[in-house]
Amino acid sequence: MKKILSRALVVCLALSSLPLASCNANSSVGKRQENVLRVASWDEYIDEGGEDSYIPTSDALYKEFEVWYKEQTGKSITVEYITLQDNETMYNKIKMGDEYDLLCPSEYMIMKLAAEGLLQKYPESFFDTSIETNYYAKNVSPYIKEVFENGKLKDGSSWSEYAAGYMWGSTGFVFNPEKIPPEVMKSWNALTNPLCERKITAKDNVRDSYFMGLGMYYEEELLTLKEQYKNGLVSRETYKSELKAKMNDTSPETMNGVKKKLEEMRGNLYGLETDEGKLDVIMGRLDASFQWSGDAVYIIDEAEAYSEEDENPLLLEYSIPESASNLWFDGWVMMNGANVDAATAFINFLSIPINVIRNMYYIGYTSCIGGDEVFSYIEETYGSDDESEILTEYNLSYFFGDNHILITTEEQTRRQLFAQYPDEGTIDRLVVMEYFDKETNTRVNRMWNNIK
């Protein structure tokens, strides 16, 4: 992982001002072709092979899939792997008539595409664990499986009917515990705390910003609710339902309260950022930043590597607010008219344990796939038997299944391991943010544009 992160930092420095482009020169065609699987995803979101791969002699995974598919089916397939800039770019291309077999959007865009009737459901055979090559159904984490089966679309369908999980994570704060007390970073109001004045950044996008605003606006109510749940006064179902309702509240009254919180936040920030803020934290110029968990791992890794020759290396930590935070995921979905056989085979190929490990190593994010082989990789990455350090048990059974307990250093429960796999108590307070309908989207964008 260190190799790819160092490479990514160089790319970030050199190309941060350039737009992302497709890795396939023919992507502008936009139409399906016979024996071609059109896959749309994000830049550097799959193992591209070569020296930065977990297996340096390997080819890109989507190229290796072509060989595997021929071996499995006797049929030839060419993967046209297209990278897009963001979810909105993906949506606009679809609305303009571009056709894809597989897409890898984020959770809210999956909901939007499904609601607009642009996606087709997975066949029942995809979930049949008796089929040898159904690696996704056999290996998906029990936690992710539950999230997808319990998540509902407007028509009552489960997310699992339309989406197969790829990567997942949380949102929280990366921070320097030597400069800002960890207790401060357990609250959404760190964004307005004088101790963080001009030392913290937030995301320059409306969805993350509105979620942060909701966190500040409802923090006291959510902490009270959490205490009631902890003391057995409310059920888990009630707790999760209330969390979801509060952290997806877009009523005019709530939006006005959120606006005031975000205005207060804006005056306390160093600035709003997309990717450039990562480097400021890595270099020690900023003390805290709101980040997605995968980027948090990258920042923590790079800050330590950059300062490793210093007398006091920069050891950043990751904190998820105590009241609530965001559970995000990217998932594979099929457009109407997709090549179902090739599309589902592609997902299953990526769900083979060694390919899961390759993707996690290359990307730095956390796969939706569990299983013993992936746990062994996490154990290899974060486990420790060094008796000179403070060791602790870290229970990952919620994700990998019963009796998957990692022996790790105490500091990892606040650093990369915690960012990739929060403990089960933290998982309970994570909630998915749903998509905005057209009217809500107009209101929230108007509010955000007036603030930033």
Q: What label would you give each PLM region?
A:
Residues 84, 104-105, 202, 272, ...:
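Short beta-strand and adjacent tight-turn residues that come in two discontinuous sequence segments
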Residues 267-337:
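Extracytoplasmic/periplasmic substrate-binding proteins
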Residues 330-421:
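Mature extracytoplasmic/periplasmic domains
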Residues 402-452:
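Conserved C-terminal helix/tail region of periplasmic/extracytoplasmic solute-binding proteins
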